[in-house]
Amino acid sequence: MKEKRITAQPNEGKLFNFRLVLFAAIFLVVGIVFCFYHRFYSLSSLWLLCLIPMAAFPIFLSLPFGKWKEMGLIFVILCGFCLMGFFGFGVEVNRYENVSSFGECYFSGRVVEMSKGTNSVKVVLDDLRIDGEEQNCKLVAYLPTSLHDKVTLSDELFLHGNVEKREISAEKFARAAKDFGKRIFLTANDVEGEKTGHRFDLFLFLNARAKKVIDEGMDKTPAAVTRAVLLGNTAGIEEGLYENIRYGGIAHIFAVSGLHVGSLFAFCLLLLKKTPMRRSHGTLQFFFVAIILLLYAGICAFSASVVRATVICLIAYLGKLIQVKTDFLQSLGGAAICILIFTPSTLFTVGFQLSFAACFGIAFLAKPIGQVFDEGAKLYRKYFPMKLTEAELQAIENEDTMPPRISTRIYRAVSSFLATSLAAQIFTAPLLLQYFGYISGWALFLNCIFVPFISAIFSLLLILVTVACLMPLELATAVLYLPNVIWSAVLLLFEVVDFTSFALEGVSISAGVSLVYIAATLFFTDKWNLKKSLRFTLGGACVLAFAIGMVALNL
């Protein structure tokens, strides 16, 4: 059966094709950003009146005139999402403002996060009670030496210490946004106390078991890297090593996201195809994949990047089962809504911004960059034509089709990968400069090595850790011997080579200049219903404006 397409159809005379879910997500973001400036910078609420022309603008530019009921409904939906973002973030801010410092007191809670440093153990407590009163927030505490080896995830603690409210300023909100979204508003110092019990939590139990097995079965550095790749926990990686990995441009392999979830998704599809499950009903297959992906997302604490990738994979798989071709931009919009509707402050986290910037870069630029590669390949073949075999000549004469050559298939795979990688790096470049102060010169080269490597090893690594979790702890070393050796060999590269030597550093960029940069890239895409000459003219003008802005900022 032929697949149906649910993307918007081109509209004659309109600038772009309207995607309702994508624009709903955009207006949700607008509402969150407006509330941020309203609450932290006292921006007047009267500016909300600008919502009317803002919502009308994309509708009139992308929808045909005359369908007033449809246009009115879409207008209401966009305004509604904007207001949801505004009030949703406002609720989070109110929750923070209603918390106060307690000073010296007794408090209890359940350990939901835990990270071990050299001389301390940091825990996050949920279900918090202070002096017997329930609190609608979480607390960070650094445990005393007496509790270092006694506490695990989901343990219940009764402690005494000095509890203070964490100060969160607008200027440093991006660094605090992750904890803000988790409602971690309090910090306890000079802590003493005891463990009082344990409450079972499936996700925390699986997370703790995986960490324990990995630490028991592998050497220190390979274990830290394995925890990062599988669980997104980079706390155990030695600081110098992690900094070198960052400058190599591949730190994203430790932020569990589309690369990891996509590998797990592909493995699930392989299981369905190669086992008796292939004969089961499509609904059962979908629920099997959904349960596996959601279970993994839960073990990773439902981080924004994991939720985004999970939603996109499930939407794509559902579309395949019901024979409807899905739209990547719509899926991205849906994933953003699923995250921001519950925790609007996630918008300001670096991980969320980098994750979605990379995906939007792929959606907008991968195809145009691939077309540039194809034009280059055509030009090369013009001067260096391929010699056709007798079978190919015979097929041409008989007007038959031949399967592509191995060299052609290799070119397609390599060009597709390079186009995707370049597109993601182009869109994330301003964020890397803004938050980290550099852009790696090694990124493209090392991504060509490590992205396929992680894609290939991830499922194997997950299977081996799962098997080790099901077996006695004493056998973990034997089960995890292979990944331990592989990581030890791979990490030698980052011990030997200093990747900080080739990076663009010391360059400043502002939010306004970043927007001009993004506008320039968007005009070079095929998402506009404009003549190519006009798109390139507008894109060139934005490039010039970007260059002028960067020179002005960095002189």
Identify the meaning behind each predicted range:
Residues 1-96, 482, 523-540:
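N-terminal leader/targeting segments
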Residues 5, 28, 302-542, 549-554:
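Internal transmembrane alpha-helical bundles of multi-pass membrane proteins
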Residues 5-17, 26, 181-312, 317-318, ...:
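Aromatic-rich juxtamembrane segments at the membrane interface
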Residues 51-53, 258-269, 510-523:
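Hydrophobic alpha-helical transmembrane segments
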Residues 82-104, 544-555:
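Hydrophobic alpha-helical transmembrane segments in integral membrane proteins
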Residues 96-103, 146-151, 201:
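Short, surface-exposed secondary-structure edge patches
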Residues 113-196:
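OB-fold single-stranded nucleic acid-binding module
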